[in-house]
UniProtKB/Swiss-Prot annotation:
<feature type="transmembrane region" description="Helical">
    <location>
        <begin position="230"/>
        <end position="250"/>
    </location>
</feature>
<comment type="similarity">
    <text>Belongs to the auxin efflux carrier (TC 2.A.69.1) family.</text>
</comment>
<dbReference type="GO" id="GO:0010315">
    <property type="term" value="P:auxin export across the plasma membrane"/>
</dbReference>
<keyword id="KW-1133">Transmembrane helix</keyword>
<feature type="transmembrane region" description="Helical">
    <location>
        <begin position="40"/>
        <end position="60"/>
    </location>
</feature>
<dbReference type="GO" id="GO:0005783">
    <property type="term" value="C:endoplasmic reticulum"/>
</dbReference>
<dbReference type="Pfam" id="PF03547">
    <property type="entry name" value="Mem_trans"/>
</dbReference>
<dbReference type="GO" id="GO:0009926">
    <property type="term" value="P:auxin polar transport"/>
</dbReference>
<feature type="transmembrane region" description="Helical">
    <location>
        <begin position="315"/>
        <end position="335"/>
    </location>
</feature>
<keyword id="KW-0813">Transport</keyword>
<keyword id="KW-0927">Auxin signaling pathway</keyword>
<feature type="transmembrane region" description="Helical">
    <location>
        <begin position="289"/>
        <end position="309"/>
    </location>
</feature>
<keyword id="KW-0472">Membrane</keyword>
<dbReference type="GO" id="GO:0071944">
    <property type="term" value="C:cell periphery"/>
</dbReference>
<keyword id="KW-0812">Transmembrane</keyword>
<feature type="transmembrane region" description="Helical">
    <location>
        <begin position="138"/>
        <end position="158"/>
    </location>
</feature>
<feature type="transmembrane region" description="Helical">
    <location>
        <begin position="7"/>
        <end position="27"/>
    </location>
</feature>
Length: 370
């Protein structure tokens, strides 16, 4: 049962996130410490340094031989349902190539909103209070799989979109932004629905499949977030199989960078907020859609996946509640780096985290009667 002390622990875990967010927001909006280019550089630092070290340090601490693979499989089924639903929606979109490209881009954002959650900062203390230590261990295992499987797949989707929709290379090529877009939102492609095709062309250059696959594969191979996950899994298997441990100097070097992951991600989000005209940058309609995907569609997909795998009782309840945890911070960081609906993801993280506690407690109360 959840007591006031447990609520305080969860709030205490969430409050530092908003402290870092506020510092980032004030640094741009009030104190004018950073230019737009410097803000982009800070986010790039988070993507290529803070997040990979955070992922590696987190993954190597988890015993891969002690995982509950039934729960992991149920989570995978729920995410596969989200992917299938987004892909089916994108295929039903009619119109020109630019409109279809916009639908494909929105399907990536929709998957992020429905499937990628903040399992550590909010999930660990809350689920420990609800169900005990075993629930904490399970949610950590889900977080590890999210870091080493689903985030690399998200990065692959971003790279494929960049190659196929935007036109490959280092930026927007034949697919150009609408001239009515405000300067500070030029990087957020399809903010009003679609990429605008260049005169005389379609929705962007469609590269040959194998050339695209090679380009995307090379980019992913060079992405520190991908090989941080792979190296983390490899070392975890070796370490827990033969009871080895990293030297203290190596562990200290990793942790001095990994501890910046969450804080700098929220700071970068604050910088992004400070550059927008409104705190809720994407508007009420998209905010409501994001909340529906996060707190309704995600848990429903997990219910289907968990039922298909035969989960029952408290384990089923845990799977549903962890799917209703607030939006993953890393999903915003990657969206900002790739210029895809960062305003939608930032609003989902900020507003969703604020309202998540009463929603999660409501889920806990309702599931208690099932």
């Amino acid at each position: 049962m959840i007591g006031w002390g447990d609520v305080y622990k969860v709030v205490g875990a969430m409050a530092p996130l908003y402290f870092a967010l506020g510092l980032g927001y004030g640094s741009v909006r009030w104190w004018r410490f950073f230019t737009a280019e410097q803000c982009a550089a800070i986010n790039t630092m988070v993507v290529y340094f803070s997040m990979p070290f955070f992922t590696f340090d987190f993954v190597v601490r988890t015993d891969p031989f002690a995982m509950n693979y039934r729960v992991i499989a149920a989570d995978a089924v729920s995410k596969a349902i989200a992917i299938a639903a987004m892909a089916a929606w994108a295929r039903t979109r009619c119109g020109c190539a630019a409109a279809k490209a916009g639908a494909q881009s929105w399907s990536i954002t929709g998957f992020s909103l429905a499937a990628l959650n903040n399992t550590l900062v909010v999930g660990v203390p809350l689920l420990d209070a609800m169900y005990g230590r075993w629930a904490q261990d399970l949610v950590v295992q889900i977080a590890v799989v999210q870091s080493m499987v689903w985030f690399p797949l998200l990065l692959m989707a971003f790279e494929l979109r960049k190659a196929w929709v935007v036109g490959g290379g280092g930026g927007v090529g034949p697919a150009v932004m609408s001239s009515s877009s405000p300067p500070e939102k030029q990087s957020d492609v399809e903010m009003n629905g679609a990429v605008v095709a260049a005169p005389g062309g379609g929705g962007g250059v469609r590269l040959p499949f194998w050339a695209t696959a090679r380009t995307v594969g090379l980019k992913l191979a060079r992405n520190p977030n991908v090989y941080a996950s792979v190296l983390g899994v490899v070392w975890a298997c070796i370490a827990y199989r033969w009871h080895l441990s990293l030297p203290g100097i190596v562990t200290g070097s990793l942790q001095v960078m990994s501890r910046t992951g969450t804080g700098m991600s929220m700071f970068s989000m604050g910088l992004f907020m400070g550059q927008q005209e409104r705190v809720i940058a994407c508007g009420a309609g998209l905010t409501a859609l994001g909340m529906a995907l996060r707190f309704v569609a995600g848990p429903l997909a997990t219910l289907v996946g968990a039922a298909a795998l035969g989960l029952r009782g408290d384990v089923l309840h845990l799977a549903i509640i962890q799917a209703a945890l607030p939006q993953s911070i890393a999903s915003f960081v990657f969206a900002k780096e790739y210029g895809l609906h960062a305003d939608v993801l930032s609003t989902a993280v900020i507003f969703g985290t604020l309202i998540s506690l009463p929603i999660l407690i409501a889920y806990y109360a309702v599931l208690g009667f099932v």
